[in-house]
C-alpha cells in the first residue's frame, strides 16, 4: 500500500562539502511541497533535510523525539553538535563512512504551521522527500520516541520505501498516562500565554516533561541533598537542573512547534497488523511514557515481522540518548548488510 499525497514543486539550493580523506559529503537543503494533511487539508510546506555519507552507500534515516532536527552529529561540513552525537561517528553502526545518514526537520518544527499534525503527515512528507532525493528505498529507518511513531506510519503507508524499521521507545498508540502528562504540559503553556509570559509557560512544560523522561531512581541518586532556604523560600536539590532544562528548551524551541508536535504524539494511532516491514522494537524497562507492556503488545501485533529487545536503564524514556553504547550494539546487528562482519 502506498499513498499519493504530495508533489514537490521546488528543490532549493543546497550546500555541499567534501571530506577528501573518506569521501564523506554533507548536504543540506529544503524542498517546497504541497501536502494533503490528514486533519488540515492541503498545505504548502518546506521540508528541510541533511544527508551525510559516502555516495552509493545504503541510506539510513534517523529520526528522534519532537525536539530533534535534521542535524544528527557534527561533521566536516557542519561542525555544531547534533542531537544524536553519541550515536553517530567512526566505528558506530551509524558511521557516515559506511552509511548515508538522512535527517530531516519534522513538519511543524519551525513553528510556522498552526494546525493539527498527524504522524501520517510526517510519513507522507518523508516519502516525498525520498522522491526528491532519488532514494528509492531506505536500508533502515531508526526512530526514537516520536521518530518511532513516524517510522511505524511510514512502514504502513509506504512499505516499499524502507527495508527495515528499528523503533525505540515508541508504540502503536500513546499510553493514556503519558497523554495526561502532555495535556498538563500544554495547559502550562496556555497559562503562561494568558499571563503574557509564554516563555515561562514553555519552560515549566519542559520541566514537567523532564520528570516523565527520567526515573525516580535517577533522581534519587542525583538529587538526594537536603533542601535549602533561599531568600525565604525552600528550594529542593533538583530545581537547578529543572530550571536549566527549561531555559535551554525555550532558547531553541518555538511555542507553537512544541504545542503542535506534542499534540501529534497524542493523535498517533496505528494497527500493528498493518505493518508489513520487518521491525525491531526496543523497549526500556522503567520508561514511564512508553511502558514495556505497550511495546510487548506492539510486537505481538506485528507477529512474525516483529522482534523485541528490552533494556534496563535508570534513564527511562531518555535511555536512547544516554545508553549510546548499548543502543549502538543493537543497531549494529539490526543494520548489518549481508557479508558484513561485526
Specify the residue positions occupied by each region the protein language model found:
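N-terminal cap/lid subdomain of alpha/beta-hydrolase-fold enzymes
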Residues: 50-107
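Conserved hydrolase catalytic core segment
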Residues: 137-176
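Short beta-strand/loop motif that positions the catalytic acidic residue
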Residues: 275, 281-283, 287
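Conserved alpha/beta-hydrolase "acid-adjacent" motif
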Residues: 288-294
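Conserved acidic catalytic loop of the alpha/beta-hydrolase fold
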Residues: 120-140
